Amino acid sequence: VTDIEADGPTPLHNSMLSFASVAIEADGTRHGEFEAVLTPRVDRQPNETTMEWWATQPEAYKAATEGAEDPALVMPRFADWVESLPGYKVFAAAPMIFDGLWMDHYLDQFAGTRVLGGPFRTRQIFRGGGVCLYTMAGTLRGAPYLDWGMSKLPAEFYGHIPHTHRAIDDARGFANVLVELFRLSSALPPITGSASDFR
């Protein structure tokens, strides 16, 4: 499970400041953590609105910017770490469209790999399309789409870890959520199909 912090909404114009990942299995078995702070890209600019928000989060911003390293060094190191983990690896985030987008862009740019697994002739460190905790939580709650949201889950699902916007804190909380969601999904009746159903 990965959480990222950035100085704007899009990797096309802004920079990822920090990220953290917790390697965890569906049953809660943990295999380690990875945390990094990245130097902002010289070809990107901070988003004014995002920086105004960061001004209200001084401790989180300090954690997201101190001890920064070149992403060209960090992202290959992260890819190596992912490959060193046991079993097959699946990227998970909340929501996938935000954190996954950033990580996919940086991995592609600096490590020659992707968050997405597929029929690509490149280094592949993850399998499949990944897990969106936002979607998984919303559907398993049985909530209508406009009532989805990670804040709608009880604190127990997070293991009572506060959401601080420090990447490692948030990744740890979301890792606990993932385990709880798999616990819920395991109680559901299976749905089966065949290859001929999908063309």
Residue spans for each PLM region:
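Short hydrophobic beta-strand that contains or immediately precedes a catalytic carboxylate
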Residues: V1-D3
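Acidic, Mg2+-coordinating catalytic module of metal-dependent nucleases/exonucleases
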Residues: V90-M96, L101-W102, L146-R199
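Conserved non-catalytic scaffold segment of RNase H-like nuclease domains
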Residues: E5-M96
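Residue-level signal for well-ordered alpha-helical scaffold segments within enzymatic catalytic domains
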Residues: A26, R77-D80, S84, L101, ...
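Substrate-recognition/cap helix-loop segment adjacent to the acidic, metal-dependent catalytic center
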Residues: V82, I97-G128
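A structural motif
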Residues: E52-P58, A143-K152
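Short, flexible loop segments at boundaries between secondary-structure elements
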Residues: G118-L146
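Glycine-rich, phosphate-binding/catalytic loops in enzymes
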Residues: M16-A20, L107-A111, S185
